[in-house]
């Protein structure tokens, strides 16, 4: 039997690194600063996340008594989850950030009207990390402009490819 080359191992490790993405956040908000936060999880939640049963699309983060919590994110428990713990799918989960980061985020949220939106859930070595972004909501005309720009970029690439192929 032959061993897999090192490239394949590295490629597969990065492919399984991302657990869940919030693509809707890019559509609904102008994302500005991004932060990496740890999550305070229970054992059954980590097992469920390993099985790919996490959803952060409906989630958001808010500041309560100087700490940041993730609200509305769903981690569906496994059937064979621990019997001595009653799993709650949408409980508030504490985000672990440095005090300076919390203070910076707190001032931007309170004074400038930003929202904290989860954008990605991923593994960093053996720990689950959440990427949160400071965001401002888009108006409907902003969404239309973004769609037009995206379509224009796609058409431009198509024309350039066709031109380069014919040349």
Swiss-Prot record:
Q: Does the keyword RNA-binding apply?
A: yes
Pfam families, alphabetized: SmpB
PROSITE patterns linked: SSRP
| Record keywords, A-Z | Cytoplasm, RNA-binding
GO CC annotations?
Answer: cytosol
Which NCBIfam families does this UniProt record tie to the protein?
PRK05422.1 (NF003843), smpB (TIGR00086)
Name the record gives this protein:
SsrA-binding protein
What species was this sequence derived from? Xanthomonas campestris pv. campestris (strain ATCC 33913 / DSM 3586 / NCPPB 528 / LMG 568 / P 25)
Gene name as annotated: smpB
